[in-house]
UniProtKB/Swiss-Prot annotation:
Membrane-spanning ranges: none
Catalytic activity: a quinone + NADH + 5 H(+)(in) = a quinol + NAD(+) + 4 H(+)(out)
Main subcellular location of this protein, as a coarse class: membrane
GO cellular component: plasma membrane
Record's protein name: NADH-quinone oxidoreductase subunit C
GO molecular function ontology, one term from the record: NADH dehydrogenase (ubiquinone) activity
Pfam family, one: Complex1_30kDa
Enzyme class per UniProt: translocase
Organism classification: Bacteria, Pseudomonadati, Pseudomonadota, Alphaproteobacteria, Hyphomicrobiales
Membrane topology type: Peripheral membrane protein
Subcellular locations according to the entry: Cell inner membrane
Organism: Methylorubrum populi (strain ATCC BAA-705 / NCIMB 13946 / BJ001) (Methylobacterium populi)
Length: 219
C-alpha cells in the first residue's frame, strides 16, 4: 500500500506539473499575442515563464502584465542584473513579478549595454526605485527617468561596479580606519607576499626523489 500510495502521489505531482506548464504556455501565448514585437522570445523553465522584451518597450510590457485581468501580475518582487561580458549587449535586467490571482510567476528580461539606459519601471511599480539604484550601483546599468539614480550599497566615491564579471576580486582601494589620523582612509590595494622557498621534492607529493639524509644503505 505504501508503494502504491507513493506512486500515486508521484503521479499526481507529475500531472499537476504538466497542467502548470500548460497554463504557463497558454499565458505566454496570450502575452506575446497581445504585446506583439515588444516580446522577442519567451520560454518555460522550472515552472516559471520567462519573457525577453525590447528595452524601449519595458514600461509598456510591465503595464500590460500588471493591468490585464488575464495576467494580473501586480506583485512586484525585485529587479536584478546579470553580466555576460562576451555579448555585445552584456547586461540582462531581470524583473520578477507574481500574480496571486493566477498563482503564477513571470520573469521579464531586457538586454542592454553600459551606455544604453533602460526606461525606469517606477511609473508602473514605485517599489522599483531602490532596486534600480542597486542594479545601477552593482552593474552600472543606467535607468532613464529615474528620479534619483545614485549608488545605494557601496561607499561614496566608490570606483567601478562590483558585480561586473571584469571587476577585480580585491577591488581597487582598501578602506580602513587609521588610528593615527582618527579617520577612515582609502589606499590602493597592495597584495605583497614575501618570498617563500617551496620544497618541490617533498615525499608527501608521492615522488620517487630521494632527499638528503633519506638514503638507505644498499643490502
Amino acid at each position: 500500500m505504501e508503494a502504491i500510495t507513493t506512486n500515486g502521489i508521484t503521479l499526481r505531482r507529475t500531472v499537476a506539473a504538466a497542467q502548470g506548464d500548460d497554463a504557463l504556455r497558454a499565458m505566454g501565448e496570450r502575452i506575446t499575442g497581445a504585446l506583439g514585437p515588444a516580446v522577442t522570445d519567451w520560454s518555460i523553465a522550472h515552472g516559471e515563464l520567462t519573457l525577453i522584451v525590447q528595452g524601449s518597450d519595458i514600461v509598456y510590457a510591465l503595464t500590460y502584465l500588471r493591468d490585464d485581468p488575464n495576467c494580473a501580475f501586480r506583485c512586484f518582487i525585485d529587479i536584478c542584473g546579470v553580466d555576460y561580458p562576451q555579448r555585445a549587449r552584456r547586461f540582462d535586467v531581470v524583473y520578477h513579478l507574481l500574480s496571486l490571482r493566477h498563482n503564477m510567476r513571470v520573469r521579464v528580461k531586457v538586454q542592454t549595454d553600459a551606455a544604453t539606459p533602460v526606461p525606469s519601471a517606477i511609473p508602473v511599480f514605485p517599489a522599483a526605485n531602490w532596486f534600480e539604484r542597486e542594479t545601477y550601483d552593482l552593474y552600472g546599468i543606467l535607468f532613464s527617468g529615474h528620479p534619483d539614480l545614485r549608488r545605494l550599497l557601496t561607499d561614496y566615491g566608490f570606483e567601478g561596479h562590483p558585480l561586473r564579471k571584469d571587476f577585480p576580486l580585491t577591488g581597487f582601494v582598501e578602506v580602513r580606519y587609521d588610528q593615527d589620523e582618527a579617520r577612515v582612509v582609502y589606499e590602493p590595494v597592495k597584495l605583497t607576499q614575501e618570498f617563500r622557498n617551496f620544497d618541490f621534492l617533498s615525499p608527501w607529493e608521492g615522488t620517487d626523489y630521494v632527499l638528503p639524509g633519506d638514503e638507505k644503505k644498499s643490502s
